[in-house]
Regions:
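Loop/turn positions that initiate beta-strands
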Residues: 443-446, 450-451
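Short amphipathic alpha-helical interface segments
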Residues: 334-346, 417-426, 818-825
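Short beta-strand-centered aromatic/proline hotspots
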Residues: 453-460
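A contiguous, basic/glycine-rich beta-loop/short-helix subdomain that forms a polymer-engagement track
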Residues: 125, 169-170, 174-179, 384-439
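Extended, highly charged accessory segments
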Residues: 352-355, 359-418, 478-479, 483-825
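Helicase motor core with emphasis on the C-terminal RecA-like subdomain
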Residues: 2-396
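Short, solvent-exposed secondary-structure boundary/capping segments
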Residues: 461-478
Length: 825
């Protein structure tokens, strides 16, 4: 009796997919199977309560929702197996921490232990994830399947040709971009089905629209999380059925959603992390004995060297370690609320005994529990009534706030707001900026690129960002930067190591071609592409100038900037940039703007500092004790928009701020003042230091600098910028992303036209009610008619075919509320 197997997946789309795949087996083996998530209809939920399935497929959030329910708790008592799919997606996030606590609550309900099975394609530290899966002090077995033997990778750095110049003018773009598109198109035409992964939604939209402007009938579509469900399902089916040859996608298709057989995976630009590359390329060759094939198309020298390093590491299975969040307080508060819902009186030691068995909370203390309960007790309305003398938490008399908090915060995924960008001169909308971008850069005076043009933020009001166009793009930040995946410390250092090898071998008298050939034996790329990616390095060495490496930081002046070349990755460089910016601001009294990428830091000097002074500052930082570095960085961090964003996310998860509260309307000072000394403040700081900054490696490189293991050199260039600096300057001046306004207008018109023509809608006849079909807008005739009765009375809905079948059966009469709502669309 009751549910025997609980199958937990990170995505609703995976639930739908699993249901389709398991249905046949379950029907033939007489096993009851059901899916439950946020969109499950009331009728289906009632059916599950009356007659529980043997296997329940669900998400972590829905498990949270059913744990307090009296009837479902009875059904959960029969559980013998819990399967967690795509476990790597959970382990390094707060969703995973929350799930690990929920599984401890589930053990309380079941009254005995059950077997947990975790499934994942790519894990950097299997032992850690295994412990995360089963909890502390429980036995676990790891079954490894080697991936490298079954994977073939190649890095390509396309060179523009005369054909690309012609194509560039047709597509209103640059020859370099046209060359990349041409290579991708050739790959798509040579294969049956391809997944084309990008790192951000913005880039996937641009790529898909460029293909459609090139050829509206080209069988490629787009797939990402922001698309309507119907468009996503139509794209998945199109690839599965062979109507499409390729899908441009983001991480939405990284996980195991079934899109049929994939011959090849193309990664547009460096995947930035080894695990991501393996996960993405692993989507191809999904048959026993088949090889997974992947091609990485790169855009510049940094991108190519980075992709080469990541590809080599993937083939050698040198994956990034999984970082499990350290006893997050927000997940703990939510799970304590879940316990209080079912038990009127809870002693601190009871909470401690239950939750310390979960791996992220292995070193949980009574003080941690007290800190979280103090907030729950002191807030209004209370989430718990706590006696700190007796060390006991009681359910509050009025439980409305407790229920609202628990069921309103089932998800640990932060609600990211979006901001409308408005041109102040014409009051017309320009585009959208996300919360991540606004947190780090959303201040008046910031220059950024959106829709191919540079703009300057004038002021932010509510959810609108008022801007005006500017002529000089130097220092402008691309609007999609908030979405970018951080490059790990180890990857960036290996890029620096390649540059040091080239320098060493050239000093020994070797020719660049010979060096490129040697590197081609180590890295999966052609000699010619490797040689092109080393152009700037070779040029700098030929000028008798030192190049930045894994063991050398170089500093130089360029126009209004000081450039610090540091091969230490995104999070270490961000921490170093923040530290430099803060110390310089304290010294000069001016706000110093800093930008960073995985290989360099740009300090906008405004004439107040030089490369010589930056070198002195770096040496001063290297001489600081570790505790002083941490304290200085903490002081710097709490003043940033990044910290404000994390603080708001944590406060929302604690129920301290309503989900709709506007990010920009809350002053950072008042926020910090409100939460200082609370569990919310501590957790926000912890999250910032885990997700946004890499303090461990920052301290390591400063120590190596002090010990002389890393050298620090000034480059003399008369302010012109060294060859390697040019790569960063190209990015910071955004030359390749700028498009003249008149060409931009043509691009937007053509892109919108192509996108609308490729939308898929459900067409249904409201006369005979016997016809429903998913049709691409482009394929509709000028005068569409019902093929069954010839009527012109056709309705067009943004829904799936299946969801309209019940309406068809009823001939549009005696509809339920949800069916009427659907028809009114």
């Amino acid at each position: 009796l009751g549910i025997k197997v609980l199958y937990i997946t990170p995505l609703r789309a995976l639930n739908r997919d699993l249901l389709e795949r398991l249905q046949w087996w379950c029907n033939n083996l007489d096993i009851k199977l059901a899916v439950r998530h946020g969109d499950t209809e009331t009728r289906e939920r009632t059916r599950q309560a009356r007659s529980p399935p043997d296997i329940l497929i669900t998400t972590p959030e829905t498990l949270q929702a059913i744990l307090p329910g009296w009837i479902m708790r009875q059904h959960l008592r029969g559980i013998r197996w819990v399967i967690i799919d795509e476990v790597h997606e959970m382990a390094d996030s707060k969703r995973g921490s929350q799930l690990s606590l929920a599984l401890e609550r589930l053990r309380l309900i079941v009254g005995r232990d059950f077997q947990i099975i975790g499934l994942s394609a790519t894990i950097g530290t299997p032992e850690k994830v295994a412990k995360f899966l089963v909890g502390n002090d429980r036995e676990v077995e790891i079954v490894r399947v080697p991936v490298a033997r079954h994977m073939k990778l190649k890095v390509m750095f396309p060179q523009p040709t005369s054909i690309d110049n012609e194509l560039a003018s047709r597509l209103y773009t640059h020859p370099e971009v046209a060359a990349r598109l041409r290579i991708i198109r050739e790959l798509i035409e040579k294969h049956q089905s391809i997944l084309l992964f990008t790192n951000t939604r913005a880039i996937s939209e641009v790529l898909a629209s460029r293909f459609k402007v090139w050829d509206v009938d080209f069988p490629v579509s787009i797939h990402h999380g922001s698309l309507a469900k119907t468009s996503r399902i139509a794209a998945e089916r199109g690839l599965k059925d062979g109507a499409l040859k390729g899908l441009v996608c983001t991480s939405s298709l990284e996980l195991g959603i079934d899109v049929g057989r994939i011959d090849l995976v193309v990664q547009y630009m460096s995947p930035r992390q080894v695990t991501r590359l393996i996960q993405r390329v692993g989507r191809s060759g999904h048959r026993i004995g088949r090889i997974a094939k992947g091609v990485i198309i790169t855009m510049d020298s940094d991108d190519t060297l980075e992709a080469m390093v990541i590809a080599r590491r993937a083939l050698k299975e040198e994956l990034e370690p999984v970082i499990v969040p350290h006893k997050p307080y927000d997940a703990l508060a939510h799970q304590i609320a879940g316990l209080i819902l079912k038990k009127r009186r809870l002693y601190f030691y009871e909470i401690y005994d239950i939750f310390r068995k979960a791996y992220p909370y292995a070193d949980l203390t009574i003080e941690d529990i007290e800190k979280v309960l103090r907030y729950m007790h002191e807030r209004f309305p209370r989430l718990a009534w706590v006696s700190f003398e007796d060390m006991v938490a009681l359910k509050p008399r009025r439980t409305k706030a407790l229920f609202e908090y628990y069921f309103g915060n089932l998800s640990m995924i932060p609600d990211e707001k979006q901001y409308l960008v408005v041109d102040e001169t014409s009051d017309s909308p320009v585009g959208i900026l996300d919360e991540a971008f606004m947190a780090e850069y959303g201040k008046p005076g910031t220059k950024f690129i959106i829709r191919g043009s540079p703009w300057k933020i004038i002021h932010v009001y509510g959810e609108k960002v008022y801007v005006k166009p500017v002529d000089d793009p130097t220092g402008a930040i691309p609007s999609w930067i908030g979405e970018e995946i951080p490059v790990p410390f180890e990857v960036a250092r290996e890029v620096g190591w390649i540059r040091s090898v080239v320098e060493e071998k050239m000093k020994q008298g070797k020719k660049p071609e010979e060096i490129a050939l040697e590197l081609a034996h180590e890295y999966p790329a052609d000699k010619e592409d490797i040689l092109r990616s080393l152009n700037e390095t070779i040029e700098q060495i030929s000028r008798k100038q030192p190049v930045p490496t894994d063991k050398r930081i170089t500093v130089e002046d360029w126009e209004d900037f000081v450039i610090i070349h540091a091969h230490f990755g995104s999070l270490t460089n961000r921490a170093l940039a923040q530290l430099i910016g803060h110390v310089l601001s304290e010294q000069t009294g001016y706000t110093v703007a800093v930008q960073h990428d995985p290989y360099r830091i740009f300090v906008q000097t405004m004439g107040i500092t030089t490369s010589k002074e930056i070198i002195e500052l770096l040496n001063k930082l290297a001489g600081m004790p570790e505790i002083t570095i941490r304290e200085t960085l903490t002081r710097a961090t709490v003043k940033t928009g990044l910290f404000k964003r994390r603080l708001i996310h944590v406060a929302r998860r604690f129920g301290a701020i309503k989900k709709w509260v506007d990010f920009s309307s809350v002053s950072l000072k008042s926020l910090v003042k409100s939460f200082e000394g609370t569990a919310i403040y501590d957790e926000a700081l912890k999250e910032t230091f885990t997700k946004d900054l890499d303090v461990k490696h920052l301290i390591q490189i400063l120590r190596e600098l002090k010990e002389g293991k890393i050298e620090l050199l000034k480059l003399e260039n008369e302010g012109k910028g060294s060859p390697i600096a040019r790569i960063g300057i190209e990015r910071v001046s955004m030359k390749t992303d700028l498009i003249p306004p008149e060409r931009m207008r043509l691009i937007l018109i053509e892109s919108a036209k192509a996108r609308l023509l490729n939308e898929v809608r459900a067409i249904t006849c409201v006369d005979c009610w016997n016809y429903v079909e998913m049709v691409r807008i482009k394929d509709l005739p000028d005068n569409p008619k019902c093929p069954r009765c010839g009527s012109n009375a056709l309705g067009i809905l943004e829904e799936e075919e299946e969801s309209l079948l019940s309406i068809m059966e009823k001939k549009g009469e005696k509809l339920t509320k949800s069916e009427k709502k659907l028809m009114d669309k």
